[in-house]
């Protein structure tokens, strides 16, 4: 079994898509190991997205991610990282395949409903950012 980290972004929470996305998580065969509803501080967002610090969108991304509540989840299933990336679709919802989470729920390339780890190594780091080991089932 493989683990991945996902986050429902402020737009998905604001637009009341939490239930729909959680249903999709279960339908896709993921086990939810841990889940938290919280609001990131700007400092936390900057630390979480530090890998993008040199990119031109970094400050706007961090400000956006600190703008409202998020839902952080640690998930598990076979091929979890790649499968979740397929389920969420392209970063830009205009390019996302029909039926993917971003095609269904994203507002824009920036407010694109969900985050998903892009590798197993990053998934483990991202899970550790939000969860202590004893918090995971």
UniProtKB/Swiss-Prot annotation:
Keyword Magnesium on entry: yes
InterPro entries referenced in this protein's UniProt entry, alphabetically: NDK-like_dom (IPR034907), NDK-like_dom_sf (IPR036850), Nucleoside_diP_kinase (IPR001564), Nucleoside_diP_kinase_AS (IPR023005)
Enzyme class per UniProt: transferase
- Swiss-Prot/TrEMBL GO biological process terms: CTP biosynthetic process; GTP biosynthetic process; UTP biosynthetic process
- Name the keywords, alphabetized: ATP-binding, Cytoplasm, Kinase, Magnesium, Metal-binding, Nucleotide metabolism, Nucleotide-binding, Phosphoprotein, Transferase
Any idea of its EC number? Answer: 2.7.4.6
A GO CC term assigned to this protein in UniProt:
cytoplasm
Q: Which SUPFAM superfamilies match?
A: Nucleoside diphosphate kinase, NDK
The record's subcellular location field reads:
Cytoplasm
Residues annotated to bind ATP: 9, 57, 85, 91, 102, 112
State the needed cofactors, names only: Mg(2+)
Q: Where is the active site?
A: 115
Q: Indicate where this protein is primarily found.
A: cytoplasm
Reaction(s) this enzyme catalyzes, per UniProt: a 2'-deoxyribonucleoside 5'-diphosphate + ATP = a 2'-deoxyribonucleoside 5'-triphosphate + ADP; a ribonucleoside 5'-diphosphate + ATP = a ribonucleoside 5'-triphosphate + ADP
The Gene Ontology terms for molecular function here are: ATP binding; metal ion binding; nucleoside diphosphate kinase activity
Q: What does this protein do?
A: Major role in the synthesis of nucleoside triphosphates other than ATP. The ATP gamma phosphate is transferred to the NDP beta phosphate via a ping-pong mechanism, using a phosphorylated active-site intermediate.
Protein family according to the UniProt entry: Belongs to the NDK family.
Its quaternary organisation is: Homotetramer.
> Under which name does UniProt file this protein?
Nucleoside diphosphate kinase
Q: What organism does this protein naturally occur in?
A: Leptospira biflexa serovar Patoc (strain Patoc 1 / ATCC 23582 / Paris)
Give the classification, highest ranks.
Answer: Bacteria, Pseudomonadati, Spirochaetota, Spirochaetia, Leptospirales
């Amino acid at each position: 079994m493989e683990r991945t980290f996902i986050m429902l972004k402020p737009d998905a929470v604001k637009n009341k898509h939490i239930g729909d996305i959680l249903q999709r998580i279960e339908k896709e065969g993921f086990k939810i190991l841990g889940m938290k509803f919280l609001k990131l501080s700007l400092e936390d967002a900057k630390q979480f997205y530090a890998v993008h610090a040199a990119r031109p969108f970094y400050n706007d991304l961090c400000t956006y991610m600190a703008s409202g509540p998020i839902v952080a989840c640690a998930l598990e299933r076979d091929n979890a990282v790649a499968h979740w990336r397929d389920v969420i679709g392209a970063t830009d919802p205009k390019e996302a395949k029909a039926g993917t989470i971003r095609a269904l729920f994203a507002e824009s390339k920036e407010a694109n409903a969900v985050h998903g780890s892009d590798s197993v190594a990053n998934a483990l780091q991202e899970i550790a950012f939000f969860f202590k080991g004893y918090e995971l089932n």
